[in-house]
């Protein structure tokens, strides 16, 4: 097996991961904060009039992913909110939410007033037991309000409980898990059921409610989901209840989204939809401001309605309205619109308090900046409100840009390790292919050339955003090089691959800067009959491949037969046929039920099958009831996972007993393809038809030139490794993924689960988003080791490379070495780019997400799937 070579390779891979991790540790440090808790700089509050605060109580209602148009546009169904605005009882805003637009960093922002670090986006997925993000010892408006002997009650997203230990902050509380996106109703009902008791209970001063259902609907069906109207009406009804029950009290109602969502319902990036949630202050007291605003407004694509503010401006505004010191690390500015509640002389005092708090932070970091200090003194002497706001805006910009400090020691150590690994990988690769192997050097330079060109693209933000263009170019170049440089026969297969690549390229929206409605997936969503015909065809083909392409049927027949025709007459073959098609039908049934449960129209000709599936489990479909098949979907997924597990175990065990060495790679690949179908969205499923066509055509091209390629296996390794790299990346982007966190698909992350499990849900999330790369990783093993089996040519299967017991590990080693070179060069270039452009405008919105995606590529795809899993599968053959 060449254990020493493998030991060295795994050691290098581990060092590569260590170097990359150390770099990330230095590049994504925790945000620098000033310790301690703030006090009024004069010892007395400037926010009170006649010794009274403007408000005594607060109700903060956070509606997760409440984009501004959901509140204010003429597409909105929140009629009571519109009524409040028209009656001058509410102040509406669109609030800019700093990326990354995920819940944890946004909650930090709206409670401390600080800007989030990108590290918070990673920690957002931590499980409920993680308390590393606690804000117990950091100043926040919760701490300040509580310090005034105020009592908090909290119900909703348990992310709040990670930030604020409930035993320290909340009198009553109940958390709901924010990651179980299949739940649209219970997750909100568990919040609302507390309202009847709490609204009439005078033992609270602040009530925090965080609703998750709207966000979950977005993840599952997008902003135009059939469930969106009902959820908006539900939220509007809750706002009406909260407002009317507290209208006679001195209570401030704040309704807001922590972030928005993009046009596919996800978030995490920096698009207009994601960064522009709504923010509403409601109270009869606002009538005195006489804003005379109208609502709803016409829908607009930039999602900017009414006045545009920073979301963190909420923090000093709450401090002003509720009379407590502005939190020490706040970077928000008191919202100008609310100053009309005070007399002109008091307005200046409020802004001076905000300025004092800003300067405390600024002087702690820039003690010797006399220009800013002089400008500050001038603003204090000015009687103009605008001068104060200009100064605050300037300091806010300076503090925001310097909120995070890089740990340069970690960055340099990580970079040094990555440089060393790239040099070693380059040396090992060239030593093997230029010294030991007999390969034509041009193939070696083809691979290195593509690796270099790919690595260079990381130094331009637009190329990272549109990376699919690079892989489309590489795929075509690779195909032509494969065909013409090897003088391969069968032109028809060349054209089949070329057409297949073009279809794959156009399957989904693949970039961040340019989008188009003219994609295959968009067309299929508009033509559901064709969509489900193709889905049936995909599942049918998968069942046929599982049944007949490999050697599964030979493992279960009662005796050995010479031909497939004789095999199918065997009783064991019949059992295999039934099990295979039943397993595929379970996954198809799940897809159909999931599609219906998400509120989408099922074709009329499939309704009978849907009803039969539901009735088999004692469910009668009620058109008025939403999300009624949730439990059935969990059950179907569990059954499928068990069936797939049984198929794999039976194939391995019976194969060992009957000493069937050929076809195992193909059998495992086909069964796992069924799992990948299960983890893909319905409009993505048919792309696997094209994948299978391209794989079969590539196998035929290689088979027709078998004599030449078998004479030089190293040449075969380079060709297939390069081809699989191109197909892995092209398929990743063509299935709707990008280098933005906003396109991470969670719709299939909870298949088979009733609750959130960070590890298992993480596995399913990876498989859902990297289904294409996983498919082509398995396909590359088939093309190398079982090419004739892929071509259904069992008579030649004895010539496949999988039968070379000792050489097969050397072959996989060479493939893994090539992958290591590619990822080490690319990883080094990426981190060098991020370090060089660390002050670039798009460092957090473009380059930093790519760092996280590349970590998934190198650790999970290259090391875990391409190397470790491939080695494990090969050991079974």
UniProtKB/Swiss-Prot annotation:
InterPro entries: Alkaline_phosphatase_core_sf (IPR017850), Phosphodiest/P_Trfase (IPR002591), PIG-G_N (IPR037674), PIGG/GPI7 (IPR039527), PIGG/GPI7_C (IPR045687). It comes from Debaryomyces hansenii (strain ATCC 36239 / CBS 767 / BCRC 21394 / JCM 1990 / NBRC 0083 / IGC 2968) (Yeast). The chain crosses the membrane at residues 409-429, 443-463, 464-484, 528-548, 570-590, 634-654, 683-703, 716-736, 758-778, 817-837, 854-876. It is a multi-pass membrane protein. Its EC number is 2.-.-.-. GO terms for biological process: GPI anchor biosynthetic process. Gene3D superfamilies: Alkaline Phosphatase, subunit A. It holds the Pfam family Phosphodiest. Keywords: Endoplasmic reticulum, Glycoprotein, GPI-anchor biosynthesis, Membrane, Transferase, Transmembrane, Transmembrane helix. Pathway: Glycolipid biosynthesis; glycosylphosphatidylinositol-anchor biosynthesis. CDD domains: GPI_EPT_2. Belongs to the PIGG/PIGN/PIGO family. PIGG subfamily. This is GPI ethanolamine phosphate transferase 2. GO terms for molecular function: CP2 mannose-ethanolamine phosphotransferase activity. Ethanolamine phosphate transferase involved in glycosylphosphatidylinositol-anchor biosynthesis. Transfers ethanolamine phosphate to the GPI second mannose. Glycans are attached at residues 190, 368, 611. The gene is LAS21. It is found in: Endoplasmic reticulum membrane.
